[in-house]
């Protein structure tokens, strides 16, 4: 859907082994664009994507799109014979209640993606995958149960990533930063910059810096005014001296198709 919205023609899909690999391929110039999940309404932020973005602040977000997520249990044998369930860790977590009720003794095995899980279970009478109905058609699998996600309104926000110049105009801007010091009021001082400029923070998420226990990187989404303004540039200028590192992934349009 993101590809269609941005009118990307003659798209060639490149197989990758995980979300970090997807971002790395883009950063290394092996592809022109990448689509990654960033946040789920049930399980929260997708940590692999967040960590990969922090490693590649040169990338920019071109568009965001929220889509409804409905998982199916797919396999080649009957549900009664399933002893192993494969899927991406996020999908397994989003279906944990259903699995506990219907397959309490099945071993849950994480994979790099739901599509990879579907490929791995094809032909096995005792393995099943949590994936989309589309994956069933692509890999010749039967639909053993649908839907299997615990929350009916399950939604995921996806990002279209590109290399190149960042936009300063859009519905939302995404930033990530680390602070000079872990001290009382340091984070409050940084976030106060948004309030002082009348900007709404629609999301904040923290990830370990991976350097020291208790040291964090903060990911922030900021709602931007509809009318053109210097609000984003002014915010970044005010934040810069407060941060050890500040990554600006650009401003971009954001759409929600989960209600369609």
Language-model segments: what does each one mean?
Residues 1-260:
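Domain-level signature for soluble enzymes in the chorismate/prephenate branch of the shikimate pathway
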């Amino acid at each position: 859907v993101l590809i269609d919205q941005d009118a990307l023609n003659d798209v060639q899909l490149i197989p990758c082994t995980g979300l970090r690999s997807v971002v790395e391929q883009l950063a290394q110039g092996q592809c022109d664009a990448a689509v990654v999940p960033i946040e789920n309404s049930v399980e929260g932020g997708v940590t692999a994507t967040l960590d990969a973005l922090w490693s590649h602040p040169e990338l920019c977000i071109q568009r965001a799109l929220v889509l409804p997520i409905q998982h199916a249990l797919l396999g080649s044998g009957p549900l009664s014979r399933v002893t192993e369930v494969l899927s991406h860790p996020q999908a397994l977590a989003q279906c944990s209640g259903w699995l506990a009720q219907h397959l309490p003794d099945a071993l849950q095995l994480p994979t790099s993606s739901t599509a990879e899980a579907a490929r791995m279970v094809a032909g096995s009478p005792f393995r099943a995958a949590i994936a989309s109905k589309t994956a069933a058609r692509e890999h010749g699998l039967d639909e053993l149960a649908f839907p299997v996600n615990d929350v009916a309104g399950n939604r995921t926000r996806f990002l279209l990533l590109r290399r190149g110049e960042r936009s300063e105009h859009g519905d939302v801007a995404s930033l990530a930063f680390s602070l000079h010091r872990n001290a009382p009021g340091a984070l409050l001082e940084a976030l106060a910059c948004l309030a002082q400029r009348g900007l709404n923070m629609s999301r904040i998420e923290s990830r370990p810096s991976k350097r020291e226990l208790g040291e964090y990187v903060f990911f922030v989404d900021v709602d931007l005014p509809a009318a053109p303004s210097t609000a984003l540039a002014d915010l970044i200028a005010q934040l810069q001296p407060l941060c050890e590192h500040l990554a600006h992934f650009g401003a971009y349009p954001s759409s929600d198709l989960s209600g369609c």
